[in-house]
């Protein structure tokens, strides 16, 4: 396929994961998905390629529902490409993990279940919706063209409810258990890089923290204000009968620490939401997080209080006691960029518009669309050799930095320019298109 050299350099990294026929069809589906708007289906991608009269169209469906190619290997290649492109050698790799709901209603989808719908729920009412719940891992990176951090997905795993797991005859695994199985793979893939795994309260699990400690991965998550924290056990001066104690005296609840006037607070400016910083009061300490019948988990906790009273007092913890409070707060705040990725993917890449119902096609299509978000950012970065990216501005909207929509425009523009200006070596055609009309046409197609 005739593509710009910068885009070819990005997609060529994934050739080892596919056979030659599958790779060529996958490349065509990717380009067609980028060029079309609306529903992202295989038929729509073929229309975007101009292959709507292809008689052997079923072979493109086979890429998703039948062909043999390793999804985990493709995720490894994407993760390696993201880290080598945006993370300096030896720099910290911040991996955000979260779940998102893809609303699907077909009775043919075997792994469809009822999940809490965070978009429709509120603090007073919880709403459940039928669909597919995805566990998404993304690398949070800083890019040169904006002050905001971007979360680039590289791995998506389909979760199931206990009822669906029982119907399929498979053991049910919670979100934290599935995440714990990915931690060793992360460490093997990113050997030599310090890793910060950031999640919400769903990942504040002692067992997950112990797995992260065993593989030298720092887990950062919120901590309950009534968590059972203990001091380290004291060594007895003389031998005693029985088992040695695993924890020492019980520490006060963090809620009591926040209300205690004797608590020593420190005030500093920390990274906050919206690529800003805020002045916060904080206090920190180390403790053993313990529950009966489990090994204790050594954590560093941070209690954050807003001196202006705008935000509630919150507590965070990390499984790496050597991290500073500023690193812990900044790591958790960076997790929010994954929510922006969800919204951008739904708005511009057609998440939730797929119509496959076979198990293999479902488990491949949505992760491929999330990965396409990362590929668009990588392609735009490769196309902007001078660091300049287009930023669409209007008289009524003062846009200061390019967004994902602008990156998608840049990639589409490069592909369309290759399509419009292809020439034959033997009988080249000369197209006389005025620049203003061409730019209007190109903007209409790409936007």
Residue ranges and their predicted role:
Residues 1-14, 22, 108, 146-447:
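Single, function-defining residue in the core of a domain
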Residues 1-64:
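Gly/serine-rich nucleotide phosphate-binding loop at the start of the catalytic core
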Residues 24-27, 42-47, 75-76, 94, ...:
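Short coil/turn segments at secondary-structure boundaries
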Residues 34-39, 53, 104, 340, ...:
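Short alpha-helix boundary/capping elements
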Residues 36, 101-103, 200-205:
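Gly/Ser/Thr-rich loops at beta-strand to alpha-helix junctions
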Residues 45, 137, 371:
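A residue-level signal for conserved active-site and pocket-lining positions in enzyme catalytic cores
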Residues 50-51, 70, 74-75, 200:
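Short, surface-exposed loop/strand segments
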Residues 65-157, 287:
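Active-site-proximal, Lys/Arg-enriched surface segment
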């Amino acid at each position: 396929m005739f593509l710009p050299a910068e885009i070819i350099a990005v997609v060529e990294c994934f050739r080892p994961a596919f056979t030659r026929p599958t790779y060529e069809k996958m490349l065509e589906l990717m380009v067609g998905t980028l060029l079309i708007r609306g529903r992202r289906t295989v038929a729509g991608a073929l229309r975007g390629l101009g292959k709507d009269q292809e008689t052997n169209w079923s072979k493109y469906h086979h890429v998703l529902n039948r062909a043999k190619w390793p999804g985990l290997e493709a995720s490894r290649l994407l993760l390696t490409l993201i880290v080598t492109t945006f993370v300096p050698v030896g720099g910290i790799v911040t991996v955000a993990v979260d779940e998102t709901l893809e609303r699907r209603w077909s009775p043919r989808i075997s792994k469809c279940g009822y999940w809490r719908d965070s978009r429709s729920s509120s603090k007073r009412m919880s709403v459940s919706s039928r669909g597919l719940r995805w566990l998404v891992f993304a690398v949070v990176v800083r890019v040169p063209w904006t002050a905001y951090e971007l979360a680039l997905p590289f791995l998506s795993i389909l979760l199931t409810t206990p009822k669906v797991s029982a119907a399929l005859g498979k053991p049910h695994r919670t979100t934290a258990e599935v995440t714990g199985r990915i931690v060793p793979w992360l460490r093997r893939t990113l050997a030599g890089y310090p890793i910060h795994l950031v999640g919400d309260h769903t990942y504040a699990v002692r067992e997950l923290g112990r797995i992260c400690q065993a593989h030298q991965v720092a887990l950062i998550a919120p901590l309950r204000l009534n968590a059972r924290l203990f001091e380290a056990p004291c060594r007895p001066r003389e031998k005693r009968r029985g088992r040695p104690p695993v924890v020492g005296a019980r520490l006060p609840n963090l809620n009591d620490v926040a209300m205690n006037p004797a608590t020593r607070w420190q005030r500093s400016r920390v990274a906050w939401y919206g690529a800003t910083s805020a002045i916060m009061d904080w206090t920190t300490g180390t403790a053993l997080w313990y529950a009966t019948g489990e090994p204790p988990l050594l954590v560093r906790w941070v209690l954050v209080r807003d001196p202006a009273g705008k935000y509630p007092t919150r507590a965070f913890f990390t499984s790496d006691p050597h991290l500073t409070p500023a690193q812990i707060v900044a790591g958790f705040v960076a997790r929010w960029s994954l929510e922006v990725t969800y919204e951008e993917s739904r708005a511009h890449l057609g998440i939730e518009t797929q119509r496959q119902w076979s198990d293999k096609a479902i488990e491949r299509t949505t992760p491929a669309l999330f990965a396409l978000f990362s590929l668009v950012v990588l392609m735009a970065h490769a196309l902007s050799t001078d660091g300049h990216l287009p930023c669409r501005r209007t008289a009524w909207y003062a846009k200061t930095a390019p967004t994902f929509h602008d990156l998608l425009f840049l990639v589409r523009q490069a592909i369309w320019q290759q399509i419009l200006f292809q020439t034959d070596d033997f009988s080249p055609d000369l197209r006389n298109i005025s620049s203003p009309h061409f730019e209007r046409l190109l903007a209409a197609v790409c936007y």
